[in-house]
Amino acid sequence: MARSIKKGPFVDEKLFDKVQKAVASGNKSVIKTWSRRSTITPDLIGHTFAVHNGKKFIPVFVTENMVGHKLGEFAPTRIFFSHAGDRKSKVRK
């Protein structure tokens, strides 16, 4: 079920404070965050976030197309190693 419109989008307070400080100082450095659950709002456009994927931080540059999505959507947590090929048929031929 979607979040109520009356509540508004969720953005972690600490993350929002970091963005406000960056805007006030004019600093465009990477903002490190563990808050994958935060919704991207128009205030975050143009900033680069280092989003934690459980192992390392993935740089995510926020654009207009990302508004309404979550930060965690752009930092995948799982790596897909392709399924093992059919080695027996290659060896027999």
From Swiss-Prot:
GO MF annotation terms: rRNA binding; structural constituent of ribosome
GO biological processes: ribosomal small subunit assembly; translation
PROSITE patterns: RIBOSOMAL_S19
Protein's UniProt keywords contain Ribonucleoprotein: yes
A single cellular component GO annotation: cytoplasm
SUPFAM superfamilies: Ribosomal protein S19
InterPro entries recorded: Ribosomal_uS19, Ribosomal_uS19_bac-type, Ribosomal_uS19_CS, Ribosomal_uS19_SF
Entry annotated with the keyword Isomerase: no
HAMAP family reported in the protein's UniProt record: Ribosomal_uS19 (MF_00531)
Function of the protein: Protein S19 forms a complex with S13 that binds strongly to the 16S ribosomal RNA.
Family in the record: Belongs to the universal ribosomal protein uS19 family.
Protein name, per record: Small ribosomal subunit protein uS19
Protein's organism: Syntrophus aciditrophicus (strain SB)
Taxonomic lineage: Bacteria, Pseudomonadati, Thermodesulfobacteriota, Syntrophia, Syntrophales
Gene: rpsS
